[in-house]
Amino acid sequence: MNQELLSVGSKRRRTGGSLRGNASSSQVDEEQMNRVVEEDPQQQPRHQEEEHTARNGELVGADPRPGAQNDSQQGQVEENNNRFVSVDEDSSGNQEEQEEDEEHAGEQEEEEEEEEEEEEEEEMDQESDDFDQSDDSSREDEHTHNSNVTNCTSVVDLPINQLSSPFYTKTTKMKRKLDHGSEVRSFSLGKKPCKVSDYTSTTGLVPCSATPTTFGDLRAANGQGQQRRRITSVQPPTGLQEWLKMFQSWSGPEKLLALDELIDSCEPTQVKHMMQVIEPQFQRDFISLLPKELALYVLSFLEPKDLLQAAQTCRYWRILAEDNLLWREKCKEEGIDEPLHIKRRKIIKPGFIHSPWKSAYIRQHRIDTNWRRGELRSPKVLKGHDDHVITCLQFCGNRIVSGSDDNTLKVWSAVTGKCLRTLVGHTGGVWSSQMRDNIIISGSTDRTLKVWNAETGECIHTLYGHTSTVRCMHLHEKRVVSGSRDATLRVWDIETGQCLHVLMGHVAAVRCVQYDGRRVVSGAYDFMVKVWDPETETCLHTLQGHTNRVYSLQFDGIHVVSGSLDTSIRVWDVETGNCIHTLTGHQSLTSGMELKDNILVSGNADSTVKIWDIKTGQCLQTLQGPSKHQSAVTCLQFNKNFVITSSDDGTVKLWDLKTGEFIRNLVTLESGGSGGVVWRIRASNTKLVCAVGSRNGTEETKLLVLDFDVDMK
């Protein structure tokens, strides 16, 4: 369907953007051919000259006979004639000036309209080019499509001398085949064709009949019955009607064979005439004949890149392709939640409605292109925490929060790179943190949690209760669950600072925790994973199977995924507590994981990253090869397109989520391999924040902020 739509659009664009261009060019060619078979064209000017002379004689009205009038009458006539000529010259001069002014004004308007149209076309071309440049495979598909379109129209563009060449005649004879069956069209994957029975015949459309109709009937049904070519200067040849009756009496294959022989016996000009009559019938813009709702439904099957190309076909197609609801659906497919409202550089013409959803889609596409191959500009460098380790990192909106074993947290601006404030109050190193809006929560080796106001830096609450280091926490709305080396978990109200529940059952330090508002899931050094009901403080399930410490957890409300020092990853059913899959393949500790829509990405101390489908338990990709990390993976994050990973080797790498292919290094520390480490990474749609440093003093502790945003004017 995509190629059929675009082939119509490509032909229309090459011929002037409308079918009227084809009709006008065909009409000119037909008139030229008429003049070949009509009478001598010089006779018409001679008749016009005689008529003009006769009219002049009648208008002058002068008697050529001498003595017919006296001198006074003759003088009066001359005076009147002179006065008439003078007035006529003045009026004609004014009229000419007025016509020149009007013509000049019209030319200016036309030039302005042409300039606006050129700007619109350039803008659409740029949007389409952005999509073309983003994917090599897309460019190959487009090249193949353009080749197909060119092949379909190459006969039309051939000069007459090529049409009459022996090579052309030979190849056309070889290529022409009798096709007695119906044409079978395939549809792209995921795109289901509309059933004809689902729609009634619309006004202006020709319903498909069960029996074949003649080409003349088709032209008449299309409203072009009066446009049929009539050569009136030549009488119908003798026996024409008998020949036509004989032709109609033949079978379908016999008619095709006869047409083949007829075409081979025609001269090039005659073949061209047939093409001019037939071709417009197959270039009809069926989209413009459909009701708008149905036309938009058809266009909704196009990919965004093809939709942008379709917008360049004509004005009506561009209006359809700018439909805001159409682009909203495209945005939903890509996970874009909000439209983009921007200031336009120029006023949109009446009839063209700017689509904020389209702008949002194009902006996101350009951002993805920046991540993939955009120029890596110098990052903002945020220096702080001296030479201490950055143990935790949060990034939300334009605010960055870093926690360190120097007992402090720092709040940074992701826009300016400035340190906005330092949160001081803990008496031990900060090892865990969470952030939402203007609230920051931190856990420390001093056995407390603190709730901070990110705007003012004020400590709102200090939460006491744990008897050892607060090693992990998870925030959900107004509650936070903390896990400690004292083997317990506590549920806190961050608004009041009260401890609501205490969950006891582990026999070793709690290393990781997840909370969805209903259930708490915890992993500990006792090899166990536990599922809790925090309201009743009861353990619903103890998930046994790991043979070493549990270091990482993910929980989506249905599945629990646990990573252990025993090198395995286990997928559990949270309702039954059963182990669904055991994912094997890593060779060491799984230090970090992230789960979205049944896709799990795991990073391991064996320097590899794996992508899994937790429903099937299948490993989809292993991110390795010559460009893989050379040391343990420290942190990772992924979205619908990319996987970002950091490592002890001092690099941050970008990978393709679908193919597993390495794209490029986003960060490479000069001290990488000799002590430089990327401890933590956090990424938004447009920014990447990296916490870097070293354990031997070779790399200064700092934050690096990379920006991949685009300017949508």
From Swiss-Prot:
Keyword Protein transport (UniProt): no
SMART domains according to UniProt: FBOX (SM00256), WD40 (SM00320)
Modification type Phosphoserine: residues: 26, 233
Pfam families given in the database record: F-box-like (PF12937), WD40 (PF00400)
The protein, known as: F-box/WD repeat-containing protein 7
GO CC annotation: chromosome; cytoplasm; endoplasmic reticulum; Golgi apparatus; mitochondrion; nucleolus; nucleus; Parkin-FBXW7-Cul1 ubiquitin ligase complex
Modified residues (Phosphothreonine): 211
Single GO MF annotation: cyclin binding
Organism of derivation: Rattus norvegicus (Rat)
Gene: Fbxw7
Role according to the record: Substrate recognition component of a SCF (SKP1-CUL1-F-box protein) E3 ubiquitin-protein ligase complex which mediates the ubiquitination and subsequent proteasomal degradation of target proteins. Recognizes and binds phosphorylated sites/phosphodegrons within target proteins and thereafter brings them to the SCF complex for ubiquitination. Identified substrates include cyclin-E (CCNE1 or CCNE2), JUN, MYC, NOTCH1 released notch intracellular domain (NICD), NOTCH2, MCL1, MLST8, RICTOR and probably PSEN1.
UniProt-annotated location(s): Nucleus, Nucleoplasm; Chromosome
Residue spans of biased composition, Polar residues class: 69-84
Biological process annotations from GO: DNA damage response; DNA repair; lung development; negative regulation of gene expression; negative regulation of osteoclast development; Notch signaling pathway; positive regulation of ERK1 and ERK2 cascade; positive regulation of oxidative stress-induced neuron intrinsic apoptotic signaling pathway
Subunit structure: Homodimer; homodimerization plays a role in substrate binding and/or ubiquitination and degradation. Component of the SCF(FBXW7) complex consisting of CUL1, RBX1, SKP1 and FBXW7. Interacts (via F-box domain) with SKP1. Interacts (via F-box domain) with pseudophosphatase STYX; the interaction is direct and prevents FBXW7 interaction with SKP1. Interacts with cyclin-E (CCNE1 or CCNE2). Interacts with PSEN1. Forms a trimeric complex with NOTCH1 and SGK1. Interacts with NOTCH1 intracellular domain/NICD and NOTCH4 intracellular domain/NICD. Interacts with NOTCH2 intracellular domain (N2ICD).
Residue spans of biased composition, Basic and acidic residues class: 46-55, 136-145
